[in-house]
Structures are given as C-alpha cells and as structure tokens.
C-alpha cells in the first residue's frame, strides 16, 4: 500500500507522514532517509528531522538512491511501515550520484529515468506493509537553468506516475485527499 503526500517545502508534510506512519497499526516503523548531507544547512535540516523523530520508535535507514535496496535491511518487511523522506532528494540523487543512472535522465524525455525510479518504489511497496512517500511539487520558473527545469519536470513526472499506484494521495497545496482504493 502506498500513501503519497505532496506539498511545497516546509508545508508540514513530514509531520503528517510521521503521524500516518506511527498510527498505521504495524509493529515496525522505518524512516528511509534519502537526503545526502552536503553542507551546514543540510546538517541542520537532518538534525531537525532526527529531533522530530526522537523517542517515537522509528528505526532509520539512510539510502540516497536505489531505495528498493532497503528491503534487505528491514527485519520482517511485511510487518513494517516505511516512511520515505523524500522523493525530491531521491530524484536529485539519482540524477547526480547514482553511477548507473546519473546520465539516464539526459537520454530522452525522462521517461526511462522516471520508470526506473518508479520500478524501485513499487518493488519496495510490494515488500512492505505500507510505504508513505513524502514529495514536493515545485513551480517552474523560466529563470531556472536547464538542469533545474529538468529536475522539476522529472519530479513532477514521477509524482504523476505514482498517483495511480497510491491508495491515498494527500495534496497539502490544495488541501485535498483522494483515496483511490488501490
């Protein structure tokens, strides 16, 4: 089962995702962190999220790309909720850090790149009780450089590709919640 939480940065997505994860009824709750810390601002953001989770019963895995690898590190994955924070970081990491995929996004309209990530996410979702995915949706701006515009487009493509697979989609930008019945 997949729950997708979409919003703008600092919109409360993380707090909502944690609430869903902790109240989901599964005995184990994994926080799957995708952020690569590269500077002091990243350290502060990571520390803020760690503090939010402190004492709540999460165990943490840090996997910046190829998130389907998390399954092998989870004891009894079928009884586990996984909170993936966040898809935005994952897309950037796949674009720049994954040695096998970092050029894939440049080859076509992005379909092969987004399909590869979607495949990883669906494999993870098929192996765990509940996968909660936190993601951003950014507004495009003509002043952004080409690579940034590509990143925004790829993230949006992946968000749209996930929606049909999600049991519920919560869009904090519009305040809507859709339950699809998947």
Q: Where are the language model's segments positioned?
A:
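Conserved P-loop
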Residues: 2-75
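Generic beta-sheet signal
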Residues: 3-5, 29, 78-89, 131-133
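Residue-level signal for inorganic ion chemistry
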Residues: 17, 49, 83, 136, ...
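A structural micro-motif
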Residues: 27, 56-58, 80, 129, ...
């Amino acid at each position: 089962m997949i729950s997708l939480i979409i919003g703008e940065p600092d919109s409360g997505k993380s707090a909502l995702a944690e609430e869903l994860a902790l109240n989901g009824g599964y005995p184990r709750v994994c926080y799957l962190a995708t952020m690569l810390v590269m500077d002091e601002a990243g350290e502060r953001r990571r520390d803020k999220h760690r503090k939010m989770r402190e004492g709540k019963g999460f165990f943490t895995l840090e996997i910046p790309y190829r998130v389907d690898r998390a399954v092998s590190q989870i004891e009894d994955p079928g009884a586990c909720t996984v909170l993936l924070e966040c898809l935005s970081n994952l897309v950037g990491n796949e674009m720049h850090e994954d040695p096998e995929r970092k050029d894939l996004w440049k080859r076509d309209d992005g379909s092969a790149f987004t399909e590869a990530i979607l495949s990883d996410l669906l494999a993870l979702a098929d192996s765990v009780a509940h996968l909660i995915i936190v993601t951003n949706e950014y507004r495009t701006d003509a002043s952004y450089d080409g690579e940034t515009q590509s990143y925004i487009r790829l993230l949006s493509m992946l968000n749209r590709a996930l929606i049909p697979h999600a049991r519920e989609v919560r869009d904090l930008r519009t305040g809507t919640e859709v339950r699809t019945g998947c």
